[in-house]
């Protein structure tokens, strides 16, 4: 059984193995396929049209499946690897070990945002950004520049306390847990972290930055935490809702999995802590 650990607790060997697996997926082309898929859904998901990966109830199960697919790809390279999660309420500084040269590397230089250290820096020669919005082929970050503070634990707790998963109009204007976690309403959790990191993380091509996977692993954990606190509150909508994914509808691009199939993460992995 895969155990997803807090990235702050990874051993040096676990970090090394994860980095090596990421670099291999990049080398063999599979990594960029995930970037392309994510960007297609960012572009296609709209408040008034069909929406699957974002701005909709299926934001959480869609990303759960997306991360599962990516984690399995990593494990085909190295079976010992699991996706760690980044608890940004605790590791909220640009000096956190997450950003060290032996792991993800740090922020970008002020001139152009280019990441200059770590295994994913352009100078390593191993991380050319191929799926991109412009001619810049290097990983970019501007940690804490566009928004100064990452979400706090108190802000997370305020969202975890919300008793209803989602509600009409089932988009970025909705009240409820999903939309507050996604970040279109209220304290802005998930979206704010993308903006705090900056660079490619602030675009539809956000998986170009490996921190995407650690960020979304934590968002996924928060969904699991919410489920445990609200066992009587399930995924909604259940049926007959235009433009969104109901409980038993299949989700694109896989077309073989429903939100109902992804409500229990323990069939696939557990977390190191509640």
Predicted regions: what they are:
Residues 1-274:
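C-terminal accessory segments of proteins
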